[in-house]
Amino acid sequence: MGLDQYAWSRENGEVVEGAEPQFVWRKHSKLQEFMEQKFTEKTGLEAGELNCGELELDSVDLAELEHRIENKCMPISPGGFFYGHQFQDEAEDEYRDQDIMFVEWAKRELAEGNTVIYSCWW
C-alpha cells in the first residue's frame, strides 16, 4: 500500500484500454507534490482529487519540472503515510535519472502531437 505514480501518452487524445504506462514511480513524494501543485493550478480542484485522476502535462510544465530536477529544487512534500515523505530526499536522488528520462521522453511525445498524462493512486 502506498503512492504509485504513472505516466503515459495518448495519440490524438484517444484512450487505449489496457495501455501500459511508460514510466512508473513508487513513493516519489517530491514528484507527487510537483504534480499536485500543477493539478490544482490547472483545475482549481484539491490536490487529493488527483488520486486515480489524470493530469495532462504541457511543455511549460515539463520545462519547470526539468529545471527543478536539474537544480535539485523539487518541492518538499508535507506528505502523508502513503507518500513515503520521510524518505523524499533519498527518493529524489534515486529517481533523478529516471525523472530526466521522463522529461526527455515527454517532450518528444508532445513534439509528435501526443498528449502526456500523469496519474497516481494511493
Which sequence ranges carry the predicted segments?
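Acidic (Asp/Glu-rich) sequence patches and key acidic residues
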Residues: 1-115, 120-122
